[in-house]
């Protein structure tokens, strides 16, 4: 069974823990208790393949930023979560993305942009803004509500598909690099 190491990142209070707990335990946690770091595991079937999701729910608070490099090194894919009612959390996404790329030393890392709290009546980040940023980054955008469970499975499953796509692409490039060059001519004497 394939295991996927997923990391949920974003500013404090955007609903990272609520999304993760909704996926793992099918219930909504409405009290806010800042996370330092929690790890969850769940077996799921995605596109006919049984796999194990190893999900790291991270601290959004700035005082825990020193821990980020470590979990970014071990993660295979990242959910970049912002709250649609917080323009600041949306602006912070770029910082998380750049830090992930720096730590992973890669231009392309599997990521999904997630706009959470879509059940709220007023949004400070419009759908079009988020779609435009996701398009610039070349990553999918999923709207979620941890409260109503809207888009929760979709966000995590889309990230697994992005990791698979990334592995396939790297595998193809690796095979091309390993092919010996057989363009030599022989002459019979």
Curated annotation (Swiss-Prot):
User: How does this protein sit in the membrane?
Assistant: Lipid-anchor
- Sites of the modification Cysteine methyl ester? 186
Question: What Gene3D superfamilies does UniProt report for this protein, alphabetically?
Answer: P-loop containing nucleotide triphosphate hydrolases
Under SMART domains, the record lists: RAB, RAN, RAS, RHO
**How is it regulated at the activity level?**
Alternates between an inactive form bound to GDP and an active form bound to GTP. Activated by a guanine nucleotide-exchange factor (GEF) and inactivated by a GTPase-activating protein (GAP).
Q: Which Pfam families match?
A: Ras (PF00071)
The catalytic activity of this protein is classed by the Enzyme Commission as 3.6.5.2
What molecular functions are annotated in GO for this chain? G protein activity; GTP binding
Which top EC class is given? hydrolase
Chief site of localization: membrane
User: Key word Zinc-finger present in the record?
Assistant: no
Q: Which reaction equation describes what this protein catalyses? A: GTP + H2O = GDP + phosphate + H(+)
Could you identify this protein by its name?
Ras-like protein 1
- In which organism is this protein found? Drosophila willistoni (Fruit fly)
Name the gene for this chain: Ras85D
